Amino acid sequence: MQNQRIRIR
């Protein structure tokens, strides 16, 4: 899950 890092703000 690479997108999870970018999705979390």
UniProtKB/Swiss-Prot annotation:
It comes from the Bacteria. Keywords: Ribonucleoprotein, Ribosomal protein. This is Small ribosomal subunit protein uS10. The lineage of its organism: Bacteria, Pseudomonadati, Pseudomonadota, Gammaproteobacteria, Enterobacterales. Involved in the binding of tRNA to the ribosomes. GO terms for cellular component: ribonucleoprotein complex; ribosome. Belongs to the universal ribosomal protein uS10 family. Coiled coil: none annotated. Disulfide bonds: none annotated. Part of the 30S ribosomal subunit.
